[in-house]
């Protein structure tokens, strides 16, 4: 029956059913009848419709929702020219590790990332906004910093998240951007919008994949930035001309100009465009884009106020509530974050991020039974992965439901997608073994964690403690030095190394390590006692 359908109608049907490759192939066959399919023929409406539909299909194949996906590359971090206050007031910055003043679990209970924030219950790219101070810190890869580690280039993410099959075409690119007369297209609003999205989403992918080869061979970042600017400039020119043609009354084009400015790192210009768009038409997406700008400018309080303004216009909007909760979580205000995540669940009781974050908060607040209820809820919703079963196993163990503990960890090991996940499961199994007093099993589990991931700093630290209990002092010191070099933001390796050095009489190294421990966790009482004791020793010399 499909062969009897009108080709354009069939292509539109493929597009509506998200069969974008079939849609693009059918549109290509229709356009082959025209000698040049680079531009739509205004005299043939069918060709023009097929051209627009193919552009939209190619765009959808690599489309990424930029509201949630936001990753800063090393080049963007280290070459950023935006001036941000180096000594902001407490509670007003995301770039500095937040002080725990809200009654949440301390660093001794809840681990932190390299950026200085507590580990969240839900992995999301936006947690990468904590900027490292040096290039060495930026490329370091400890496990707990996976949520704060930058990738090589932010433009490279479009290739990995998009559809790889569309990066190359046997007949060359669908549209030759250098031959387009953008002024002519800007006078046709529907055509211009489809063309803009194609340039912004699809062509950026094609250009960056060629450029990554240049960066790989030459290792030069300016090439990447220059070509990236060129692509966004095409989209920006089209958006500017279309805005001018609409007499500056079309809010959609202002949002697109703001997106171009944001991707180019021109945050103040993006802010102006988003604000202008909000004056004309208040949309949830515009609030979210503008909040992203304020987060990039390290103004979380302004972003919070903006979200609350959005809630006045759109009461109960889940994305706005979730945005507030994320910012509170990044500012280490766990109690406020949990309250807003609960508000999210009142509006959408299947919101995975809210359920996971509330469950994580209960677990680290010494309430594993309540956390278990939230993780079981995720299991009932159909989520079936290694991370969930790993969390279920830990909750069952600490809630003293031992019959389900090992079964959950077995499922987690079988569902682990990579070696890093398997290493985390073995590490947690080592904790279970320590809890039941089987040090030999714990030793083997920590070893297996290191076999799967030799950058697992926590496993090195715990293995060193077990070696110290066996009396292997030098081996324990070596393991602790490895752990502290892999994860300098963790206080445990520094404190353990200081304690061992103090016991064997190496007071100088003990004092240096204790100072590092205090810098990582200023409220650690045992570190403060050790430093006080060492200073008394030095005063007596």
Swiss-Prot record:
Assembly and binders: Part of BBSome complex, that contains BBS1, BBS2, BBS4, BBS5, BBS7, BBS8/TTC8, BBS9 and BBIP10. Interacts with PCM1. Interacts with CCDC28B. Interacts with PKD1.
Swiss-Prot/TrEMBL TPR repeat ranges: 14-47, 251-284, 285-317, 318-351, 352-385, 386-419, 423-456, 457-490
UniProt-listed CDD domains: TTC8_N
UniProt disease link: Retinitis pigmentosa 51: A retinal dystrophy belonging to the group of pigmentary retinopathies. Retinitis pigmentosa is characterized by retinal pigment deposits visible on fundus examination and primary loss of rod photoreceptor cells followed by secondary loss of cone photoreceptors. Patients typically have night vision blindness and loss of midperipheral visual field. As their condition progresses, they lose their far peripheral visual field and eventually central vision as well. Bardet-Biedl syndrome 8: A syndrome characterized by usually severe pigmentary retinopathy, early-onset obesity, polydactyly, hypogenitalism, renal malformation and intellectual disability. Secondary features include diabetes mellitus, hypertension and congenital heart disease. Bardet-Biedl syndrome inheritance is autosomal recessive, but three mutated alleles (two at one locus, and a third at a second locus) may be required for clinical manifestation of some forms of the disease.
GO cellular component: BBSome; centriolar satellite; centrosome; ciliary basal body; ciliary membrane; cilium; cytosol; fibrillar center
SMART domains (alphabetical): TPR (SM00028)
A Pfam family reported for this protein in Swiss-Prot or TrEMBL: TPR_16
UniProt entry keywords in alphabetical sequence: Bardet-Biedl syndrome, Cell membrane, Cell projection, Ciliopathy, Cilium, Cilium biogenesis/degradation, Cytoplasm, Cytoskeleton, Disease variant, Intellectual disability, Membrane, Obesity, Protein transport, Repeat, Retinitis pigmentosa, TPR repeat, Transport
Recorded GO MF terms: RNA polymerase II-specific DNA-binding transcription factor binding
Swiss-Prot/TrEMBL GO biological process terms: axon guidance; camera-type eye photoreceptor cell differentiation; cilium assembly; establishment of anatomical structure orientation; establishment of epithelial cell apical/basal polarity; establishment of planar polarity; fat cell differentiation; inner ear receptor cell stereocilium organization
Family matches, as Gene3D superfamilies: Tetratricopeptide repeat domain (1.25.40.10)
Subcellular location: Cytoplasm, Cytoskeleton, Microtubule organizing center, Centrosome; Cell projection, Cilium membrane; Cytoplasm; Cytoplasm, Cytoskeleton, Microtubule organizing center, Centrosome, Centriolar satellite
Region of interest: Disordered: 118-137
Protein role: The BBSome complex is thought to function as a coat complex required for sorting of specific membrane proteins to the primary cilia. The BBSome complex is required for ciliogenesis but is dispensable for centriolar satellite function. This ciliogenic function is mediated in part by the Rab8 GDP/GTP exchange factor, which localizes to the basal body and contacts the BBSome. Rab8(GTP) enters the primary cilium and promotes extension of the ciliary membrane.
Primary location class: cytoplasm
InterPro entries, per database record: BBS8 (IPR028796), TPR-like_helical_dom_sf (IPR011990), TPR_rpt (IPR019734)
Expression tissues: Widely expressed.
Protein name as annotated: Tetratricopeptide repeat protein 8
């Amino acid at each position: 029956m499909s062969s009897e359908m009108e080709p354009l109608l069939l292509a539109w049907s493929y597009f509506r059913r998200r069969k974008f490759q079939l849609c693009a192939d059918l549109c290509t066959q229709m356009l082959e009848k025209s000698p040049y399919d680079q531009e739509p023929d205004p005299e043939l409406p069918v060709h023009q419709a097929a051209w627009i539909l193919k552009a939209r299909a190619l765009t959808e194949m690599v489309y990424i929702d930029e509201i949630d996906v936001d990753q800063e590359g090393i080049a963007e971090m280290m070459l950023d020219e935006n001036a941000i206050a180096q000594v902001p007031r407490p509670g007003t910055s995301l770039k500095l590790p937040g002080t725990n003043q809200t009654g949440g679990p301390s660093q001794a209970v809840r681990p932190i990332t390299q950026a200085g924030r507590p580990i969240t219950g839900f992995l999301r790219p936006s947690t990468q906004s904590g900027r490292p101070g040096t290039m060495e810190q930026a490329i370091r890869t400890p496990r707990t910093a996976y949520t704060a580690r930058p990738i090589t280039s932010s433009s490279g993410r479009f290739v990995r998240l998009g559809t790889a099959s569309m990066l190359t075409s046997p007949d060359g690119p669908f549209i030759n951007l250098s031959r387009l007369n953008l002024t002519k297209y800007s006078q046709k609003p529907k055509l211009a919008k489809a063309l803009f999205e194609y340039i912004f989403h699809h062509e950026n992918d094609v250009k960056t994949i060629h450029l990554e080869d240049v960066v790989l061979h030459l290792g030069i970042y300016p090439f990447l930035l220059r070509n990236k600017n060129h692509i966004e400039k095409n989209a920006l020119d089209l958006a500017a001309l279309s805005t001018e043609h609409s007499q500056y009354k079309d809010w959609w084009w202002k949002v697109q100009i703001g997106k171009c400015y944001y991707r180019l790192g021109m945050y103040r210009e993006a802010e102006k465009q988003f604000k202008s768009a909000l004056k004309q038409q208040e949309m949830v997406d515009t609030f979210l884009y503008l909040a992203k700008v304020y987060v990039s400018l390290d103004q979380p309080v302004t972003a919070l106020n903006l979200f609350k303004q959005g809630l006045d216009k759109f009461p109960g909007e889940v994305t706005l509530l979730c945005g507030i909760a994320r910012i509170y979580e990044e500012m280490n205000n766990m109690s406020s974050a949990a309250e807003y995540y609960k508000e999210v669940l009142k509006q959408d009781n299947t919101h995975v991020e809210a359920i996971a974050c509330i469950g994580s908060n209960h677990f680290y607040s010494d309430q594993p039974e309540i956390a278990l209820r939230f993780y079981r809820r995720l299991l009932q919703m159909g989520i079936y992965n290694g991370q969930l079963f790993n969390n279920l196993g830990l909750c069952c163990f600490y809630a003293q439901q031992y019959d389900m503990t090992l079964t959950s960890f077995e499922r987690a090991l079988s569902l682990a997608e990579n070696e890093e996940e398997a290493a985390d499961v073995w590490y947690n199994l080592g904790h279970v073994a320590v809890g039941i007093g089987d040090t030999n099993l714990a030793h083997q589990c920590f070893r297996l964690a290191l076999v799967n991931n030799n950058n697992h700093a926590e496993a090195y630290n715990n293995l060193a403690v077990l070696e110290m209990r066996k009396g292997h002092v030098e081996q324990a010191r070596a393991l602790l030095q490895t752990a502290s070099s892999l994860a300098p933001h963790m206080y445990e390796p520094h404190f353990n190394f200081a304690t061992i050095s103090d016991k064997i009489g190496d007071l100088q190294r003990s004092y240096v390590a204790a100072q590092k421990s205090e810098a990582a966790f200023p409220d650690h009482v045992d570190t403060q006692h050790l430093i006080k004791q060492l200073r008394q020793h030095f005063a007596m010399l």
